[in-house]
Amino acid sequence: MLTLTVLCASLGPAVFAQGPGSSSSAGGSSRGGTTGANASGTQSAVPVAQQQLYTSTGANGAQPTQDSFHGSIIEGKSTGSNLELSLDDAIQRGLRTNLGIILQTSAQKNANGQRLEQLQALLPTVTGSASIEVQQVNLAAFGLKFPGVKPIVGPFQVVDFRAYLTQNLVNVQSLENYIAAKHNFQSAKLTAEDARDMVVLTVGNAYLICIADASRIEAVHAELATSQLSFEQATASHDAGVSPRIDVLRAQVDLQNEQQNLISATNQLAKDKLALARTIGLPLDQPFTLSDTAPFAALEQMNPQQAFERALAARKDLAASAEQVKAARAGQTAAFADQLPVARVYGDFGDLGTTPGHSHGTYTATGEVTAPILQIARTRGEKDVADAQFETARARLSDQIQQVNQEVHDSLLDIEAAARLVQTTRSNVDLATEELSEAQQRFHAGISDNLPVSQAQAQTEQANNQYISALYQHNVAKLSLARALGIAQTNYKEYLGGK
């Protein structure tokens, strides 16, 4: 390190800048430097937030969200009375209590703290100290011997009250480190805003799952009533000697199968309601019912390229990744700036004497320029690290742009396919119901046994399951499109309503 120091002294008070140091008893100052460090940013993964829809016959292929968005902090206590929970209420609760938002908000505070830490390297630093020192010196120990003079001096005391100031005048590395930290903070802020879209998608999806479960229970109740009627008809026909006992057994098996389906569907709804409560911060012992339904509502077709361009402008996670690239670029400059000279001033001013009443003002003022002379390995190492971080951030941003493009296209394809599925499965429900009615009439008239009735009941159950699943998939696809476009928080009603 090559150091150029200019020492200034005068009798009057002076104000120079920066740097905590410790003074000697004679009023000298010690030099302090501030070295910036690269602030680390917060990376945010953006998965497709679709939970699994379980039915008694299987599960669709929906992908789960990050675990943090399935948790929350509890808001309030259970009232003991039933709560009517609308989709709007659920989303607003989620935006207040969801763990994903809370963690992202904490990450934003952390990034802001790192930004302020880096900012301090560019601002004046003032510290103060007060000391009292009592000494007794043996001059002979230092080889000082004078005839007629006692070698022991003291005891005497020194009182020192002093303030220290330090200021960087030119420090490019600290400046670039602050710029990087500022971009990291902006990235964390955008990521926290993006988390709100994720919460809307997660809570909305959990609510839609519960709606699908409730629809499944309603369908099973209808199927159970049909099975009960078929069992009674088979029993009456057998008692009248018209049909064999196998018809009664077949009808009884169908009836008990539906009873099992009802138990499973009811249990699944209870579990999915617990999952919804966990997502929005409701106490798990708080009873609630869903006050909204999700009927089919077609969404106006959208041009994929226009939708992608809209997503590029609105997605907060993309903007956050762009800030990460800027932060990494500033990190490259900071790594290079480690080779540059640093200019700073520092000094101190205070009262020095034997007692506060017998003291005098003293100060020092120093200007300093330091520059590295030989640190080849460190310089190259810092450059390689900064280059790698920049290349990584840039590659992730490029990939994320394509990921958003894919999410937009996937959502549009899912909406189109699910809309056709809803129409087809709705028709299947009508046809299966008509077939069941015909089979029941033929059995009641004694034209055939109840095997066609049993088969028609199974087909009706399958058609209802497929219709419920298709309706759920259509609504989730619309909600996913709103998320892919970066407008889930503000436009989810429009997309679920199909306007």
Label each PLM-derived region with a short phrase.
Residues M1-L53, Q136, Q466-K499:
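Acidic, low-complexity, intrinsically disordered peripheral segments
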